[in-house]
Amino acid sequence: MRIRIVVANQAEAAFYDLDSRTGEPKFATRLTDPLAHLHDRDLKSDRPGRFSDHALLSPGRRGATAHHGTGGERRPRKHEAEVFARQVAGQLEHAQRNAEFDRLVVMAAPPFLGVLRKVLPDSVRLHVAAEVGKDLVNQPPASVRAHMPPDVLSELPAVV
């Protein structure tokens, strides 16, 4: 049995494999989102679009134009986190299709965990053994292993 561990926040995701109860997670790959470090003002390209509409005005007001916004403001950081979560989910779906893991443990910063949970495909969600709401992206593999739920570790063989 092989467990894939994804350790993520809104800017980075590290993927590890664990195949024994006593072993240390082995690094598999990493995804980064360089846009996650930008400020909201740097992520926004412009104000929301605007359009004109003559039909909304009363018939007696010739030549007048009404201007309307195309929608409410969208928070750029939240949007960027959703885009990155879809990339992480896509990576997990690809790995699951290629039978690279049997079980999945998701360790993510609490706000990002919720975003990631929403975008995980059902085919991947079926393999989720546990979720840990902690940002461990910059921690060494030994620390990642220390945060593994004991019941998930007990599913692994003692040695490989």
Where are these regions (language model features)?
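Terminal alpha-helical anchor/extension segments at protein ends
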Residues: 1-160
